[in-house]
């Protein structure tokens, strides 16, 4: 074999082996989670384990009632919230998308207040500020981000997808988003 051909074979082998290793260690594969009443499993990002902490008040959501969601990601080793989190939230019911947007908090705890509007509007309005760096909604100091409009206005099961896209610094984008899927029941 010529020296040039040997280099091509070695390079190709390296690419194939690297692709296989990366395929087995994809953060999104480890972070995929289903939530059916119990917390989703921790996601592995490098040497860290991040746990989703999502709390809802009231815990039993009723149609057309308001609900406050508090969403944070806990670093298990430090037992503290991960700072500068950005995530995309997608809410759907029966395969129909209801809300999809990005949310951010510098301290790592996003509070979302859902208020159903009485009336005929089929869209939502979001009360908060746009963060220039992350292009995501952030809260006014001391207040939650408010989402007005029909979101949880029908009884049944809702799918909430969360794709974590930044951690630790507003400029630190994850190579692949960490995905969580949660089922929420509305009565």
Kindly label every feature range from the protein language model.
Residues 1-34, 71:
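Secretory targeting signatures
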Residues 32-187:
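Contiguous segments within soluble domain cores/interaction surfaces
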């Amino acid at each position: 074999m010529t020296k040039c051909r040997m280099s091509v074979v070695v390079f190709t082998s390296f690419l194939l082996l690297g692709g296989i290793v990366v395929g087995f260690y994809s953060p999104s594969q480890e972070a995929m989670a289903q939530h059916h009443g119990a917390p989703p499993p921790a996601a592995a990002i490098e040497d860290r384990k991040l746990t989703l902490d999502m709390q809802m008040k009231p815990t039993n959501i009723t149609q057309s009632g308001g609900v406050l969601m508090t969403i944070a990601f806990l670093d298990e080793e430090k037992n503290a919230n991960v700072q500068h989190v950005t995530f995309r939230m997608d809410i759907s019911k029966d395969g129909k998308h209801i809300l999809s947007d990005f949310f951010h908090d510098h301290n790592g705890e996003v509070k979302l207040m859902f208020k159903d509007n009485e009336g005929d509007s089929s869209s939502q309005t979001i009360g908060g500020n746009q963060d220039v760096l992350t292009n995501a909604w952030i809260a006014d100091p001391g207040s939650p981000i408010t989402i007005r409009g029909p979101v949880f206005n029908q009884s049944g099961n809702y799918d909430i997808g969360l794709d974590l896209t930044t951690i630790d610094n507003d400029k630190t984008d994850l190579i692949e988003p960490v995905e969580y899927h949660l089922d929420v029941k509305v009565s």
